[in-house]
Amino acid sequence: MNEKYEAVIGLEIHVQMDTKTKMFCGCKVEFGAEPNTNVCPVCLGMPGALPIVNKRAVEYAIRASLALNCEVHEESVFARKHYFYPDLPKGYQISQYEKPLATNGWVELNLPNGEKKKVRIRRLHIEEDAGKNIHEGDKTLVDLNRAGTPLMEIVTEPDIRTPEEARLFLEKLRNIMRYAGVSKADMEKGQLRCDINVSIRPKGSKEFGTRVEIKNVNSFRFVQKALEYEIERQINVVEEGGEVVQETRTFDPQTGKTYPMRTKEEAEDYRYFPDPDLVPLKVKKEWIEEIKKNMPELPDQRFERLIKEYGLSEYEAGILVNHKEVGDFFEEAVRHFKEPKGIVNWLINDLLGLLRDKGISIEESPVKPEHLAELVKLIKEKVISTKIGKEVIKEMVETGKTPSQIVEEKGLKQITDENQIKELVKKIFEKHPKEVERLKQGEEKLIGFFVGQVMRETRGKANPQVVNKVIRELVKEV
């Protein structure tokens, strides 16, 4: 990026709440159902059908607001946002405008240079989702299963300055939503969607440049790529003496470029007004306090606790926290065998890589937490060596068998019997008299040679420490 300029970035994120039913009716929320099967007169916008607020969705929105350090208002108002689109059967969307549920929050980011940065949250409000248009050839099909699904719209202040910060913010937000238990926040399933507002200005300037919106970018990587391209594009326009046009653009992952869509609507275009079918949403202070009291552990709290409770490094704790299910797997394994350092090493350095190679998520892992704990125990108690452990964990991923089963079936138990190892070392000494002589003369590196010979003979099953000790003792006797 040109050093003369800085980017000013704000994000609008739609998060689908993980409720069983829709925002204003009793229809099921279900990903991948047959088109137009989860619909009723309310979400189809039939005349005379009246909305009823989903209490669980309001609870989730309050929980999310608290997790984002927002101030939750005791009164908020549902408003109609009017626009015409085939997937919006009522001709308006029920949202919140002048009086949102929550305002004035913040999220703290850990930047790669070690600094911390606060991104302020302007507002969080509740709304319903639209349906989905599916384009097939020259036809457009409309699926209204998604219409009426509960959403939260989270709007940041324009505090973000780089494409990387935008990606880090979204990753952190997804994590907070998952930890708070309000959304799976899976971008691939459309449970988290992001619109980007970006402008540029000369470094040090307090004025805002002309804002461009990039719509519906559907992965964190693409958010970063779209911003990198768009910032560069705006700088080039200004450098060549032109003016950035206020517009809505779309990002094409194939080309890595943004393209114009339509002129950006102003809020007036939506003709917001309070929804006459819904009374203002009043939330009692006691209910907010009760939700606050029962808040689950959030990512930053877990990060601190993992370091304190288990003695993990920041790097290890970071990996476990950034993938909630991986953190849950680790803690479950430690419950079965209290060896956190060993478990985290095998989890991060071995198991996750093996699962990634097979395209399996930790939730679908054939290796259960108690089995990873058992493997670490077998190594700790010197039943098998670390080297054999590597083979065993591969087999565990392939077959789903327990480590004990594999060790038993394949006869992989470590040989720790000194007499058995002594006999072996004597035979190897007989085969390599010259090397024995050199070792006696003090050529220490030959210890490694003899350990290697024993390991080869036992197919890696001899305990290397015992082998080392026996070699040192026997060489004195020769």
From Swiss-Prot:
Keyword terms of this UniProt record: ATP-binding, Ligase, Nucleotide-binding, Protein biosynthesis
Coiled coil: none
One Pfam family recorded for the sequence: GatB_N
Keyword Ribosomal protein: no
GO molecular function, one term: asparaginyl-tRNA synthase (glutamine-hydrolyzing) activity
InterPro entries listed in its UniProt record: Asn/Gln-tRNA_amidoTrfase_suB/E (IPR017959), Asn/Gln-tRNA_Trfase_suB/E_cat (IPR006075), Asn/Gln_amidotransferase (IPR018027), Asn/Gln_tRNA_amidoTrase-B-like (IPR003789), GatB (IPR004413), GatB_C_1 (IPR042114), GatB_Yqey_C_2 (IPR023168), Gln-tRNA_amidoTrfase_suB_CS (IPR017958)
Enzyme Commission (EC) number: 6.3.5.-
Reactions catalysed: L-glutamyl-tRNA(Gln) + L-glutamine + ATP + H2O = L-glutaminyl-tRNA(Gln) + L-glutamate + ADP + phosphate + H(+); L-aspartyl-tRNA(Asn) + L-glutamine + ATP + H2O = L-asparaginyl-tRNA(Asn) + L-glutamate + ADP + phosphate + 2 H(+)
SUPFAM superfamilies documented for this protein: GatB/YqeY motif, Glutamine synthetase/guanido kinase
BP GO annotations: glutaminyl-tRNAGln biosynthesis via transamidation; translation
HAMAP family: GatB (MF_00121)
Family: Belongs to the GatB/GatE family. GatB subfamily.
Assembly mode: Heterotrimer of A, B and C subunits.
Function: Allows the formation of correctly charged Asn-tRNA(Asn) or Gln-tRNA(Gln) through the transamidation of misacylated Asp-tRNA(Asn) or Glu-tRNA(Gln) in organisms which lack either or both of asparaginyl-tRNA or glutaminyl-tRNA synthetases. The reaction takes place in the presence of glutamine and ATP through an activated phospho-Asp-tRNA(Asn) or phospho-Glu-tRNA(Gln).
Protein name: Aspartyl/glutamyl-tRNA(Asn/Gln) amidotransferase subunit B
Native source organism of the sequence: Aquifex aeolicus (strain VF5)
